[in-house]
From Swiss-Prot:
It holds the Pfam family Elong-fact-P_C. SUPFAM superfamilies: Nucleic acid-binding proteins (SSF50249), Translation proteins SH3-like domain (SSF50104). Pathway: Protein biosynthesis; polypeptide chain elongation. Belongs to the elongation factor P family. The keyword Cytoplasm applies. Signal peptide: none annotated. This is Elongation factor P. GO terms for cellular component: cytoplasm.
Amino acid sequence: MISAGDFKNGVTFELDGQIFQVIEFQHVKPGKGAAFVRTKLKNIVTGATIEKTFNPTDKMPKAHIERKDMQYLYNDGDLYYFMDTETFEQLPLGKDKIGDALKFVKENEIVKVLSHKGNVFGIEPPNFVELEVTDTEPGFKGDTATGATKPAIVETGASIKVPLFVNKGDIIRIDTRTGEYMERV
């Protein structure tokens, strides 16, 4: 069992026969009245998001999520193919189960495939990836006095904001959880 007061991003639990993952949470302590936890939850089966408020003492059964390392092979339009690194079995997954999780992942990289009771519902990319900048405008010295950013396209086709000193051909580290530039490699 997990109490609502212990919620963190990524926690999964069962509620009304469904499995939800906490996307956002906020502990609220109003001046008058009891404290509560405001959450944004994602139904891991349907992908729908809902907002729900809990009492911090509410308890729900924790959902056991299996995470298995698999190699992302390729996509052929609507299906994305992953290979089990131990048994070499291939697993096709539809875009509806993956969402934007692969926008920073290159082919042949290892990702975690998430499942509950044998039903695959999504993937988890590595927390940090290193990608090459394939397109960005040149930054000029003296453009700004503060840390300004410019748009850049990385080798997977995703768009990201980078500092002005990053140029085409640079390798950069990206946090896949937030989609933010971390550093130049």
